[in-house]
Design a protein with these regions (language model features):
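C-terminal catalytic "cap/lid" subdomain
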Residues: 2-62, 66-266
Length: 266
């Protein structure tokens, strides 16, 4: 089984061969898709008059601040517009697909973050309310497994259910990692807009789990999240984590053959 995470910035820019490539993969393996889409959330939120706010952690990681209204917009865009657009694309090309969110079937449960430590414009640390952002603490794979057994490709949006049954914004890369772990997947592939991890101006084609952990302080913040998700997936028993570009011919097969991408193993 393979779990594939499609980054939000790449959903509209996938290579034209992606669908035929996926159809060929499905002849021999089961696939689960997890998607992002933060850019669309920002655009639609602003159109609705809800300015999207971003915060920076002490480690320099930028993320969306999710208050209650933003959580509703996030849920609407992720599970409505983006998820169903991907499902429609798959169906129109002869791939049986079913779109769900992490809410459905309690697929992804998370603990709501009560407080967040952020850095303000003056570089000072502040503690603010955690809003509606979650840390994944449980994956229930029954619904996904039932869809797979029915020969559907599950397409999952990264929204989690809190302990108080609230919608929570969760990181899409980590959602893919946890789903891969929960399904005991053989591989998880993070399809993005770059070829993989760059260190010292060179593409890292293969790296061990231990070396990946050691390298985290030297990795740019966008890629750092993906490498952390790779590490977490390996911790949960996934055999191989791959970071690869979606803008190449047959991107999934290319990643599986380790062509011009980053492969992380224990």
């Amino acid at each position: 089984m393979i779990v594939i995470k499609i980054g939000g910035s790449i959903v509209d820019g996938l290579h034209s061969s992606t669908i035929s490539d996926l159809k060929n993969i499905l002849k021999q393996d089961k696939v689960v898709l997890v998607h992002g889409g933060g850019k669309d959330v920002t655009i639609i939120g602003n159109k609705l008059g809800k300015e999207q706010k971003f915060i920076v952690s002490p480690g320099g990681v930028k993320s969306r601040y999710t208050d209650k209204e933003t959580a509703e917009i996030y849920t609407m865009v992720m599970s409505g517009k983006i998820n169903k657009t991907i499902v429609r694309l798959l169906l129109s090309n002869g791939i049986s697909a079913a779109g769900i969110s992490g809410i459905d079937g309690s697929t992804i449960e998370a603990l709501r973050k009560k407080k967040l430590v952020v850095v303000n414009d003056k570089g000072r640390k502040m503690i603010i309310d955690g809003g509606y952002t979650g840390k994944i603490n449980k994956i229930n794979t029954l619904l996904i497994r039932n869809l797979i057994e029915g020969n559907f490709v599950p397409v999952v949006s990264p929204i989690a259910l809190s302990e108080e049954n609230e919608f929570l914004n969760i990181d899409g890369d980590r959602a893919a990692a946890y789903i891969a772990g929960g399904l005991s997947a053989d591989k998880v592939i993070f399809i993005t807009n770059v070829n993989g991890l760059i260190l010292n101006d060179e593409l890292v084609k293969e790296i061990t789990y231990d070396k990946a952990k050691e390298s985290l302080p030297n990795i740019g913040h966008g890629m750092e999240k993906k490498v952390m998700a790779c590490i977490e997936s390996l911790d949960m028993g996934v055999k191989e984590a791959i970071i690869a570009s979606g803008d190449v011919e047959n991107p999934v097969s290319s990643a599986l053959f380790h062509t011009n991408c980053t492969v992380i193993r224990k």
